[in-house]
């Protein structure tokens, strides 16, 4: 459907029932293996290209249809197009129960053709022939009105083909399966489309056999699409989606995208072009062999006879291309194409996207699987990532707002926010970590990635590359973070992952062969990949990669600028409005791809020289138009990135190889193999190290360094109340992660001086972080105020104000409720320690008490309840005060009766009065204490209540303990 929309003219209604296709003369362009055949091939041409389908096609073995199948199809492309058309016409009736017939078809070319295998021959030709020719053929096929009906069925076949197609084989499979399987498969696709797809290409089956899992998954998705009549077009779409799915989920998401594309491409030739482009892109991504190249070439051919599929994709399938480039293509197709099936695919990807790509494999799980950075990616969201994060700044803001939850993912309160925020937080953490880990320039780049990257990543996630990048970034993001020494390699790896998926096998191979070429291709691929899905993660990771390369800033920037140049256009067209989920304009994507290629070429030519000049304009244009954040982020690093690419295209590629391999199911293997040689061992180790950094909040906090300390304490205090039940270690790590934003704020000013453009974004990001921190404080205070209102005592509110002022002193206490209680008990009496242990005090009470003592002393004077404190103990009162602050942070999560710090301050009194209330039923103690204390002062009551909610399980006992100690 998208193809149709893009093409603008649909010769045949995209959704044509098999009967319709029969009624209309089937004008399918069967492109022989030779790509040089005209884009539109008449029935007569089909005779040349009709391909016999081997008997080998098995219904269950979509993978069976593979490159081998393509060869067979090419060999059998003797049948005339008329025969094919006849078969196509016949096929609709036979579709329902033609699974066996499909096989027969494979065996009997003429009969099969009539029965529905007709399409098979077409596909075969396309696959074997050069990608461009094949694409052209596909366009021709799609053009025929008759083909529309077949197309409807075809999507499933295509999906199967896609699923069958393996990494390297997949591109071919797409081309062949789409072409060959398209006609025959579609007929069967109506009823047994999946089988038909398998059948469709006995040869295709062989190819698919290479990668049965990925394509097999796609097959079901394709079944949805069959209604869409785009035979060839549908096939193309199917391929595209499948690839994406493979990239993101492994195969599921990618496949769906391909399938949808198939449906979308049921439109006329123009649609075919779009479809071809999409297909070839996936082909480029997956194909690692000449066959892949051919398939991609065929697709490209349909789009345009451009040697490079990326360029061809961008020109013909601009909107599609964008979508195709990333999961977004599938999403874009779904959004753009009338057929609803497209949308579902997109939704799936986006689910990952928050996934951003990086989160799919690892981050996705994270992006949590943001995916889940999956966004995603995380992307993760994984996922994700990852509904898509609107923008890096937005993501950061959201993360900061949910910082306490991010800091305390384990705490029940944080869990609710963790799902969305978790993804964002993960992404943010990764991004921030990267910022902090690398030098200031690197950090700046990171910040830029955080905001722009988030969006772009989400875009990438949305695009077909989202899956790849989610996977890739999941694995690669950690890798990139893990590779402080050679950040460029990682950035390149992300590019490579995207590029591998995106660029046709032949192109990929070609680019892979020369490190520089590969780098360029990777960069191209990466851009879409970054742009797509795990906006937060993928893009962040991409940016991070850039930042990581910040040390190798020149090189890093070189890669980034090209990547950014590609991404910005995508962002401009589609992603600008959206955070990067669906908004992936094909034209923008095409521009990005072309630009990326151009940039890559420039880099290659000017690897030593500064190619940033050429890449810069695209980057500036794309970055600034698409994302202000991106714009400034990209511009400053551009020269650096260019240099970075120049410096270590090889390193980038190695990273790519490592990351890509995990990223893609199939292509990673072939691509990884190709890149593996290039992969530098240092890159991988660095990647691993970086991954740890990225993953662990500790790493983030470490990165933050001294800057984080002050904000860190404050944040720790806020979030620790919520984390009271969480183990101290986890709390510490999360605390560090939270500190990261604070450090970012501090660094933003420093970064501003370091990199004007990069700093602009980081400064904004940090500023936003600061705002978020302020918001957090506000939320805590507001929650305290709310609780005070709920609480009978006004002093609590007053206390809240004073507590807010004293908050900094409470920071040490923020370590955890258990810590807070331990400190209080230490101040009050040794007995408290044993009782405090009940809540789960992990840290030694003495340490906490020391910290609390110092802070409490400081806070004592301002405390409105100083008289109460004097009654029980100044330190204890202040500790209580500190405690309420923690609950303030906790309150949003628990939202139970949390009383302002004033209550805590009153608490010392309560403890003295409640001494008689020895620990009994905790709830009883709390109630009793509240009554007595309430009589004494409303603040006391509120204090008790506040503590209860703060620590639902142990809070009351702790209060009781404190009281008894008092």
From Swiss-Prot:
It holds the Pfam family MLIP. The gene is Mlip. Residues 354-387, 437-455, 478-497, 785-797, 825-834 have a biased composition (Low complexity). GO terms for cellular component: cytosol; nuclear envelope; nuclear lumen; nucleus; PML body; sarcolemma. GO terms for molecular function: lamin binding; transcription corepressor activity. Residues 144-810 are annotated as: Required for interaction with ISL1. The lineage of its organism: Eukaryota, Metazoa, Chordata, Craniata, Vertebrata. The keyword Mitochondrion does not apply. Keywords: Cell membrane, Cytoplasm, Membrane, Nucleus, Phosphoprotein. Required for myoblast differentiation into myotubes, possibly acting as a transcriptional regulator of the myogenic program. Required for cardiac adaptation to stress through integrated regulation of the AKT/mTOR pathways and FOXO1. Regulates cardiac homeostasis and plays a role in the protection against cardiac hypertrophy. Binds chromatin. May act as a transcriptional cofactor for ISL1, repressing its transcriptional activity. May also repress MYOCD transcriptional activity. Residues 195-207, 325-337, 507-521, 639-649, 657-684, 798-810, 937-946 have a biased composition (Polar residues). This is Muscular LMNA-interacting protein. The keyword rRNA processing does not apply. Directly interacts with LMNA. Interacts with ISL1 (via N-terminal domain); the interaction represses ISL1 transactivator activity. Interactions of ISL1 with MLIP1 and GCN5/KAT2A may be mutually exclusive. The modification Phosphoserine is found at residues 129, 486, 791. InterPro entries: MLIP. Residues 132-154, 182-207, 303-337, 354-388, 434-562, 597-684, 785-837, 929-966 are annotated as: Disordered. It comes from Rattus norvegicus. It is a peripheral membrane protein.
């Amino acid at each position: 459907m998208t193809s149709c929309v893009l093409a603008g003219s649909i010769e045949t209604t995209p959704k044509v029932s098999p009967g319709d296709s029969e009624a209309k003369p089937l004008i399918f362009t069967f492109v022989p293996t030779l790509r040089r055949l005209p884009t539109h091939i008449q029935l007569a041409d089909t005779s040349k290209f009709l391909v016999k389908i081997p008997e080998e096609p098995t219904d269950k073995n979509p993978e069976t249809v593979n490159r081998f199948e393509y060869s067979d199809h090419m060999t059998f492309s003797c049948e005339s197009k008329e025969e094919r058309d006849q078969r196509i016409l016949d096929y609709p009736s036979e579709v329902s129960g033609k699974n066996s017939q499909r096989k027969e078809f494979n065996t009997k070319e003429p009969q099969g053709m009539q029965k529905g295998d007709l399409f098979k021959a077409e596909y075969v030709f396309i696959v074997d022939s050069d990608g461009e020719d094949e694409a052209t053929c596909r366009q021709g096929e799609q053009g025929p009105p008759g083909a529309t009906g077949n197309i409807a069925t075809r999507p499933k076949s295509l999906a199967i083909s896609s699923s069958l197609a393996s990494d390297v084989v997949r591109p071919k499979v797409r081309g062949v399966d789409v072409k060959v399987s398209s006609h025959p498969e579609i007929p069967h696709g109506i009823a047994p489309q999946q089988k038909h797809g398998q059948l469709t290409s006995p040869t295709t089956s062989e190819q698919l056999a290479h990668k049965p899992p990925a394509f097999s998954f796609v097959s079901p998705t394709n079944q949805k699409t069959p209604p869409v009549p785009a035979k060839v077009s549908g096939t193309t779409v199917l391929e595209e989606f499948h690839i994406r799915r493979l990239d993101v989920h492994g195969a599921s998401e990618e496949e769906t995208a391909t399938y949808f594309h198939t449906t979308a491409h049921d439109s006329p030739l123009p649609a075919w072009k779009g479809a071809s482009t999409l297909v070839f892109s996936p082909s480029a991504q997956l194909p690692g062999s000449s066959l892949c190249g051919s398939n991609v070439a065929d697709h490209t051919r349909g789009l345009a006879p451009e040697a490079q599929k990326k360029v061809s994709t961008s020109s013909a399938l601009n909107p599609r291309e964008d979508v195709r480039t990333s999961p977004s293509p599938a999403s874009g197709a779904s959004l753009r194409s009338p057929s609803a099936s497209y949308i579902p695919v997109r939704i799936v990807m986006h689910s990952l996207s928050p996934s951003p790509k990086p989160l799919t494999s690892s981050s996705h799980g994270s992006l949590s699987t943001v995916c889940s950075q999956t966004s995603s990616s995380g992307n993760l969201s994984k996922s994700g990532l990852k509904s898509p994060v609107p923008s890096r700044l937005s993501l950061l803001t959201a993360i900061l707002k949910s910082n306490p939850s991010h800091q305390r993912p384990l705490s029940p309160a944080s869990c609710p926010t963790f799902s969305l925020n978790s993804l964002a937080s993960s992404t943010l953490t990764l991004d921030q970590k990267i910022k902090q880990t690398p030098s200031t320039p690197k950090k700046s780049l990171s910040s830029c990635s955080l905001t722009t990257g988030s969006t772009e990543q989400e875009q990438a996630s949305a695009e077909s590359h989202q899956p790849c990048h989610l996977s890739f970034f999941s694995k690669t993001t950690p890798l990139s973070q893990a590779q402080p020494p050679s950040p460029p390699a990682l950035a390149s790896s992300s590019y490579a992952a995207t590029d591998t998926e995106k660029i046709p096998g032949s192109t990929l191979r070609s680019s892979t062969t020369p490190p520089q070429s590969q780098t360029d291709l990777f960069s191209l691929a990466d851009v879409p990949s970054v742009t797509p899905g795990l906006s937060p993660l993928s893009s962040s990771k991409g940016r991070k990669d850039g930042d990581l390369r910040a040390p190798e800033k020149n090189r890093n920037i070189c890669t980034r600028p090209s990547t950014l140049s590609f991404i910005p256009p995508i962002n401009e067209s589609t992603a600008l409005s959206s955070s990067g989920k669906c908004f992936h304009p094909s034209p923008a994507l095409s521009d990005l791809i072309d630009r990326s290629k151009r940039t890559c070429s420039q880099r290659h030519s000017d690897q030593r020289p500064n190619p940033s000049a050429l890449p810069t304009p695209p980057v500036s244009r794309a970055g600034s138009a698409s994302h202000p954040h991106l714009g400034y982020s990209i511009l400053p690093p551009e020269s650096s990135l260019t240099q970075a690419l120049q410096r270590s295209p090889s390193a980038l590629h190695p990273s790519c190889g490592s990351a890509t391999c995990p990223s893609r199911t199939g292509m990673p293997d072939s691509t990884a193999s190709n890149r593996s040689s290039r992969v530098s061992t240092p890159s991988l180790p660095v990647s691993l190290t970086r991954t740890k950094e990225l993953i662990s909040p500790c790493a983030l906090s470490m990165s933050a360094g001294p800057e984080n300390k002050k904000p860190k304490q404050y944040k720790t205090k806020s979030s620790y109340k919520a984390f009271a039940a969480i183990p101290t270690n986890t709390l510490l790590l999360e605390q560090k992660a939270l500190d990261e934003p604070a450090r970012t704020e501090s660094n933003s000013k420093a970064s501003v001086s370091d990199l004007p453009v990069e700093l602009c974004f980081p400064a904004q990001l940090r500023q936003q972080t600061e705002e978020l921190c302020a918001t957090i404080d506000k939320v805590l205070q507001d929650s305290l105020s709310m609780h005070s209102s709920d609480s009978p005592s006004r002093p609590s509110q007053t206390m809240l104000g004073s507590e807010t002022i004293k908050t900094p002193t409470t920071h040490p206490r923020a370590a955890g409720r258990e810590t807070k209680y331990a400190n209080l008990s230490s101040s009050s009496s040794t007995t408290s320690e044993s009782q405090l242990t009940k809540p789960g005090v992990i840290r030694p009470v003495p340490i906490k008490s020391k910290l609390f003592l110092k802070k409490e002393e400081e806070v004592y004077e301002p405390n409105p309840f100083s008289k109460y404190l004097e009654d029980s103990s100044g330190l204890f009162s202040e500790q209580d005060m500190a405690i309420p602050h923690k609950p303030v942070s906790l309150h949003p999560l628990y939202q139970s009766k949390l009383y302002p710090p004033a209550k805590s301050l009153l608490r010392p009194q309560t403890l003295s009065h409640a001494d008689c209330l020895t620990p009994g039923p905790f709830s009883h103690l709390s109630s009793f204490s509240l009554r007595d204390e309430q009589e004494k002062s409303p603040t006391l009551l509120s204090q008790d209540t506040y503590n209860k909610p703060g620590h639902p399980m142990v809070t009351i006992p702790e209060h009781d303990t404190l009281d008894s100690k008092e």
